[in-house]
């Protein structure tokens, strides 16, 4: 059984077995008797590595044994192993030649937080969002068959990710094409079944064996000539399996379901995987694991220990903290509770982001008006549309990167019908160490083109609160997009006061240059304004724009500069350029925003500097354009 550890080691532990398993090829040379100790050492190494860098923690601890078993039984990387989401892939990275680079995890030019094809041949599919693994592995299985290759395809998906419709679309399709593939359900929340034990493990070994499979097919041929007898035999088998396993749904879809088995029992895992590796057709293995397994604090509180921050070295003085305001998500959570108290029609909807979007207090105070739909963004948006049709006032709290998954529902089910749905869009812009899969780089571009949509970008906490109220009372769909992290500590007015729609605010009057800021780069723009004696405008609204102010600024300044933490292509700056072009106004415009490439993981400050969105970068870009115009 796995050892249990109680502290994160500050000094690298001795790992004599892991030292001999730097790659899956080396791992497969170990004797099975050594694998239990390998699991203990790998768990310690993971604790040590993530303690140095920070990162996702609990999920990886829960799949130590499963990761070892998969690489031990299958011929990776020739056999294609696809991890869903990737939170659990740190042990996989350690075992696939990247152990010595784990100290660079989630750092600029270091290892990514998730599997990336460009990082290793063992990362067969890039992930970050959930529920994609089965579709990807199915595509690989089909490709192998068409190319005449014998390689296997394996998808590892969690019980949470299995709630998404995309996963079931793939589960439904795979039997139709007769794919030779394996889906491993990593059930770490006991959400499907708690029926795990010796009898279930024993049954899994029997049902996954080639002998059983051959006998079953032989019996089917014989008994098929006697329809009554075959039906009795089939029902008896299903009844016996149904008493022990919850696999009826997967069997009905056409999968050979095995499990549930203990995901921390290495001998059972290896024996079952070996049996299933040799079976044809779509195979489904249900393993039950414990999130945070082997680390006592994470086992006791898996939510808190889902991810951790970097630990400071022993004896080091605590890093000084700059005074900051509340997190933007906290501002939203407080506003939601305040507005719910004022309006009983309000409902709050989230796709499995209660903690991240700060709906915890709302869920406790208003449980009947709180809806966590799990990882089902499409359903979340159309659920809100249905509520709005009946006079409720739904607020959808969702990360920018995940709203992309429900774009059709946003247009077809909400916007076309002009329904009153407010989208509180968290994690807009660059998010730091999680990298491009989690960045909110495109929401202004894909929202502002939707007819009737109100789109707002706050520059501080108080402005955000007022924008949420503005959007809530707006007749039609509205969106407030705000970044990860804390604001500049603006004084927050407790009242639920809206803003005048489409009205920008001039924060500094200058000459020659006008900086038009959409969002949280306002402090940096004010620094540049002081350095260049430039006008600085908090634009607030991306749609509708403050057209009267834009006409005035275009007529009184020699250069307009738009600043946004969104893709330059199609973003707020594009809206300004389109408006001026339609007005027939010819004025030089400089667009500053996210470039036409994916900005890789790093600290947020490093990413902003790379994109020229810090104060220094904005000033350099403006001076360069003025020089090019002969206006320096």
UniProtKB/Swiss-Prot annotation:
Pathway field: Metabolic intermediate biosynthesis; 1-deoxy-D-xylulose 5-phosphate biosynthesis; 1-deoxy-D-xylulose 5-phosphate from D-glyceraldehyde 3-phosphate and pyruvate: step 1/1
Annotated GO biological process: 1-deoxy-D-xylulose 5-phosphate biosynthetic process; isopentenyl diphosphate biosynthetic process, methylerythritol 4-phosphate pathway; terpenoid biosynthetic process; thiamine biosynthetic process
GO cellular component: cytosol
Record flagged with keyword Transferase: yes
Cofactor note: Binds 1 Mg(2+) ion per subunit. Binds 1 thiamine pyrophosphate per subunit.
Keyword Magnesium: yes
Cofactor: Mg(2+); thiamine diphosphate
Keyword vocabulary terms for this entry: Isoprene biosynthesis, Magnesium, Metal-binding, Thiamine biosynthesis, Thiamine pyrophosphate, Transferase
Any coiled-coil regions, as ranges: none
Residue positions binding Mg(2+): 159, 188
Similarity comment: family membership: Belongs to the transketolase family. DXPS subfamily.
Function description: Catalyzes the acyloin condensation reaction between C atoms 2 and 3 of pyruvate and glyceraldehyde 3-phosphate to yield 1-deoxy-D-xylulose-5-phosphate (DXP).
Subunit structure: Homodimer.
Name the UniProt record assigns to this protein: 1-deoxy-D-xylulose-5-phosphate synthase
Organism: Stutzerimonas stutzeri (strain A1501)
């Amino acid at each position: 059984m796995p050892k249990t550890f109680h502290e994160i080691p500050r000094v690298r532990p001795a790992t004599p077995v892991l030292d001999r398993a730097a790659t899956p090829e080396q791992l497969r040379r170990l004797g099975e008797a050594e694998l239990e100790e390998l699991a203990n050492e790998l768990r310690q190494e993971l604790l040590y590595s993530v303690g140095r860098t920070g990162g996702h923690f609990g999920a990886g601890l829960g799949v130590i044994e499963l990761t070892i078993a998969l690489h031990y039984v299958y011929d990776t990387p020739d056999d294609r192993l696809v991890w869903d989401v990737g939170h659990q892939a740190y042990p996989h990275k350690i075992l696939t030649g990247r152990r010595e680079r784990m100290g660079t995890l989630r750092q600029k030019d270091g290892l990514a937080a998730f599997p990336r094809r460009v990082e290793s041949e063992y990362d067969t599919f890039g992930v970050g969002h959930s529920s994609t693994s089965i579709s990807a592995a199915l595509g690989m299985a089909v490709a192998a068959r068409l190319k005449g290759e014998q390689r296997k395809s394996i998808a590892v998906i969690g019980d949470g990710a299995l709630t998404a419709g995309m996963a079931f679309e793939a589960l439904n399709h795979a039997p139709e094409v007769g794919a030779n593939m394996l889906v491993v359900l990593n059930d770490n929340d006991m959400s499907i079944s708690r029926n795990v034990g010796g009898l279930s493990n024993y049954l899994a070994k029997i049902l996954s064996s080639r002998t059983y499979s051959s006998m079953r097919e032989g019996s089917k041929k014989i008994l098929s000539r006697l329809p009554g007898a075959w039906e009795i035999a089939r029902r008896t088998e299903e009844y016996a399996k149904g008493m022990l396993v919850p696999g009826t749904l997967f069997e009905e879809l056409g999968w050979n379901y095995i499990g549930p088995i203990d995901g921390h029992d290495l001998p059972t895992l290896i024996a079952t995987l070996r049996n299933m590796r040799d079976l044809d057709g779509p195979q489904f293995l249900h393993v039950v694991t414990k999130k945070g397994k082997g680390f006592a604090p994470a086992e006791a509180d898996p939510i808190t220990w889902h991810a951790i921050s970097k630990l400071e070295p022993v004896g080091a003085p605590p890093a000084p903290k700059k005074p900051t305001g509340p997190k933007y998500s906290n501002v939203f959570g407080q506003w939601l509770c305040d507005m719910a108290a004022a309006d009983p029609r309000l409902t709050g909807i989230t796709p499995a982001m209660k903690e991240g979007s700060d709906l915890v207090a709302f869920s406790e105070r208003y449980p009947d008006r709180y809806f966590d739909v799990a990882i089902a963004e499409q359903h979340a948006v159309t659920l809100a549309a249905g509520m709005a049709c009946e006079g409720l006032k739904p607020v959808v709290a969702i990360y920018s990167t995940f709203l992309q998954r429900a774009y059709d529902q946003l247009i077809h089910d909400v916007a076309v019908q002009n329904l009153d749905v407010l989208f509180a869009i968290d994690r807009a812009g660059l998010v730091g160490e999680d990298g491009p899969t989690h960045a909110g780089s495109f929401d202004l571009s894909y929202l502002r083109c939707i007819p009737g949509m109100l789109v707002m970008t706050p520059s501080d906490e108080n402005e955000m609160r007022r924008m949420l109220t503005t959007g809530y009372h707006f007749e039609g769909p509205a969106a407030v997009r705000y970044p990860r992290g804390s604001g500049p500590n603006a004084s927050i007015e407790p009242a639920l006061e809206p803003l005048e729609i489409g009205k920008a605010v001039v924060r500094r009057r200058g000459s020659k240059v006008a900086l038009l800021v959409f969002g949280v780069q306002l402090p940096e723009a004010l620094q540049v304004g002081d350095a260049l004696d430039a006008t600085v405008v908090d634009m607030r609204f991306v749609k509708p724009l403050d057209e009267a102010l834009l006409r005035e600024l275009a007529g009184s300044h020699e250069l307009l500069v738009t600043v946004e933490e969104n893709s330059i292509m199609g973003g707020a700056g594009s809206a300004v350029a389109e408006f001026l072009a339609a007005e027939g106004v010819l004025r030089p415009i400089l667009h500053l925003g996210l470039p036409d490439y994916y900005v890789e993981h790093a600290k947020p400050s490093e990413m902003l500097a790379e994109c020229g969105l810090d104060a220094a970068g904005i000033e350099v870009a403006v001076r360069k354009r003025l020089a090019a115009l002969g206006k320096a």
